[in-house]
């Protein structure tokens, strides 16, 4: 099935396919809905909006065909090009997204927590995201402000605050987590 590239998002207009993608891994968000539980999905008749990194992940796995507004196929390489042009540190952000997805986690936007991603073990509406992930640019060291922010955020939302970057030497995802603890 397909999704249409619109700006930096991919819109899945076929409702049945949108529901299937969401049920499979909580990909994207339904237009006009915030958080949808798996048991509510069949009641939704709205398009599914995928972030560019979500669409790329699905396209690379053959689960989604991305097309332009005129119907021409947009290959994963073109999605990567677009991401690099429009999104700072796109390669690293995508690598971090892919890292967590490949480990079996559900990865959603972490914007409401001031983070890049919220990472769930099973999915929104099933469990709470135990981790919020903040991107740390590879050339930037960790500051006292980063550590303070991590401590405050992990305490206020009771989640593991995780700084994530990609090593310039190895190309591997590197994580540093701060957990909330009651002393």
Swiss-Prot record:
SUPFAM superfamilies the record matches: tRNA-intron endonuclease catalytic domain-like (SSF53032), tRNA-intron endonuclease N-terminal domain-like (SSF55267)
Transmembrane parts of this sequence: none
Superkingdom: Archaea
GO biological process, one term: tRNA splicing, via endonucleolytic cleavage and ligation
Molecular-function GO term, any one: lyase activity
Pfam family, one: tRNA_int_endo
Keywords of the record: Lyase, tRNA processing
EC number: 4.6.1.16
Active-site positions on this chain: 120, 128, 159
Function field: Endonuclease that removes tRNA introns. Cleaves pre-tRNA at the 5'- and 3'-splice sites to release the intron. The products are an intron and two tRNA half-molecules bearing 2',3' cyclic phosphate and 5'-OH termini. Recognizes a pseudosymmetric substrate in which 2 bulged loops of 3 bases are separated by a stem of 4 bp.
Family classification: Belongs to the tRNA-intron endonuclease family. Archaeal short subfamily.
PANTHER family (UniProt xref): TRNA-SPLICING ENDONUCLEASE SUBUNIT SEN2 (PTHR21227:SF0)
Assembly and oligomerization: Homotetramer; although the tetramer contains four active sites, only two participate in the cleavage. Therefore, it should be considered as a dimer of dimers.
Protein's recorded name: tRNA-splicing endonuclease
Phylogenetic placement of the source organism: Archaea, Thermoproteota, Thermoprotei, Thermoproteales, Thermoproteaceae
Gene behind the chain: endA
């Amino acid at each position: 099935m397909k999704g249409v590239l619109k700006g930096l998002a991919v819109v899945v207009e076929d409702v049945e396919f949108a529901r299937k993608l969401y049920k499979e891994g909580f990909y994207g968000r339904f237009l006009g809905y915030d958080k949808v539980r798996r048991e509510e999905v069949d009641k939704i008749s709205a398009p599914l909006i995928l972030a560019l990194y979500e669409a790329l992940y699905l396209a690379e796995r053959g689960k989604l065909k991305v097309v332009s507004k005129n119907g021409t196929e947009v290959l994963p390489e073109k999605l990567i090009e677009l991401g690099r042009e429009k999104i700072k540190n796109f390669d690293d952000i995508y690598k971090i997204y892919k890292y967590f997805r490949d480990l079996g986690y559900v990865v959603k936007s972490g914007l409401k927590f001031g983070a890049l991603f919220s990472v769930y073990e099973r999915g929104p509406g099933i469990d709470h995201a135990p981790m919020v992930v903040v991107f740390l640019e590879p050339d930037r060291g960790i500051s006292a402000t980063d550590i303070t922010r991590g401590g405050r955020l992990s305490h206020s939302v009771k989640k593991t605050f995780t700084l994530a970057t990609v090593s310039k030497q190895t190309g591997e995802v590197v994580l540093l987590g701060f957990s909330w603890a009651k002393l």
